[in-house]
Amino acid sequence: MGSGSEGKAVFYLSHCPKPMENPMSAQLKPSEIVRQLSQHVIGQEDAKRTLAVAIYAHFRRMAANVAIDSVELTKSNILLIGPTGTGKTLLCETLARILDVPFVTADATSLAQTQFVGDEIEAILHRLLDRASDDIDRAQRGIVFVDEVDKLKAIGGEARATSGESVQHALLKIMEGAPVRLKDGRHIDTTNILFICGGAFVGLDHILTQTHTFGFISTTGGDDHKILERLNARVKPTDLLEFGLIPEFAGRLPIVTRLHDLTQDMLIRILTEPKNAIYRQFRAMLAADGVDLQIEPTVFRQMAELAIEYKAGARSLRGIFEEMMTDVMYAVPDNPGIRRVVIRSLFERAEMSTG
């Protein structure tokens, strides 16, 4: 295990989906995928590389749509492990935009709370069809991100939570890659739909500590500690079983990669560097009104510190920034003479001037 299209009233059913009509996704090399991801996602370089290689292999397989040298090419779904706010959903959303494929998210916790799991699972495919504008061929090449799958674990590590296990089995039916008949009579083949699952997996590190015994490995040179650290951080199938995933579900997630807590420097970069960075958005909005927005570096550091204190990672940054800008965005429309806004501290009022 690594760490590491649809017209209305179309009834298309095939165990071997048609070759890709737009092969551009298959032409993207892993390095190009990483480059484009990095324009929107700060940090998590290992996860980017793992995802890029997996996506490259996935779309190459779809483009070929045949066995190569008599070797059958099968789909490999992905598991992202990392704390809240580390960028799991953003990575998946950005990947879908880069690849120009329909994308939907699902919350495993919500699935576990319903008495009609099958209906909710079918609803995921219906939403994928909606995102594909009812183009079945396009939907069959989409991406589904199922978050918080760690919440489907067994209770106490022994007796399995019935609802959690039943959701895992229900998800398996669409993850395994087979034609699914929807209640409206249409069929959708999930063979080429890529499923990416995510979760914090709190407590997994304890399992890794207890089950990994790579201390016997010996190397020459000074990299012994780094090698052992990488090996011991690698998630094995048995670790996921110990955590509470059923063998069949864990087996459908052969590619596993970990995301790590964001540092203060990473959070500052998230505020300022990406194409859609919140700072850039507000500068552009105010510039449209002829106002120049300047924020001192200290303010970004203060926002990053607050996000770390909230323990919500990058997810909390927008709320912090929006709150800081409330007074400014309230004042500017009523005062067309304002031409410059300077913010020197997160905890002080902004300076607004006409010059």
Could you describe each region identified by the protein language model?
Residues 13, 21-43, 48-104, 108-355:
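AAA+ P-loop NTPase nucleotide-binding core of proteostasis motors
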Residues 2-7:
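Residue-identity detector for glycine
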